[in-house]
Regions:
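Glycine-enriched loop-and-adjacent helix/strand subsegments that border the catalytic/binding cleft
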Residues: 52, 56-189
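N-terminal non-catalytic cap/leader segment that marks the start of a structured domain
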Residues: 1-84, 88
Length: 189
């Protein structure tokens, strides 16, 4: 970004402050051969970092977000599964620092006996939002990244809730990149 005279110190600053003309410049530049861009570094020499290493707020998640998982959850709880979920299941993850791509995670083996993980698509909200009408949702999304939702099932089962078992240090590997909202079909599938 510095080679394009954009002096954002973090991706969070870019998300909050990027102008339309800067977006156009990035779009134009990204269509070029990356090794012809001043200051470009070959991928094999780069160290990839989490796109948003220090999220400003808890990460809000949508649980049991596909049919197979809903059926699995119902079996685990010994409930009948009708194929319908009238209401979404939300939970949050406290994240002090996202884990970089390829970096190991802490096992917390002193209190955790079984780690679980699920690859998830993360939606990055680009501006303040509350009670956004469905037809305007896309306008509030900056982009998407990949996260690994790591869980300590031992802790979740013992405490009968998800927060602590999903929020231990190192339980949010993220990245390696962000796809802007316009790069994917909306809504993404």
């Amino acid at each position: 970004l510095r080679s394009l005279d954009m002096d954002y110190k973090t991706m969070q600053q870019l998300i909050e402050n990027i102008s339309e003309s800067e977006k156009q410049l990035l779009e134009y530049t990204s269509s070029k051969d990356p090794y012809k861009i001043r200051g470009a570094v070959p991928m094999e020499e780069a160290r990839l970092l989490a796109p948003i290493p220090y999220p400003q707020q808890d990460v809000i998640c949508l649980g049991i977000n596909y049919m197979d998982h809903a059926a699995e959850s119902a079996r685990y709880k010994k409930e009948a599964f009708t194929g319908e979920r009238p209401f979404a299941v939300y939970f949050s993850k406290r994240v002090n620092r996202a884990v970089n791509p390829g970096e190991g995670i802490l096992s917390h083996s002193d209190i955790v006996t079984d780690l679980d993980y699920e690859a998830e698509m993360a939606v990055i909200i680009g501006k303040e939002a509350s009670r956004v009408p469905a037809d305007q949702v896309k306008d509030y999304i900056f982009g998407y990244t990949v996260i690994n939702d790591v869980s300590a099932r031992t802790i979740q089962n013992r405490h009968k809730q998800w927060y602590f078992g999903k929020s231990m240090d190192g339980f949010l590997p993220m990245g390696p990149c962000i796809a802007t909202v316009d790069e994917l079909e909306f809504p993404p599938k």
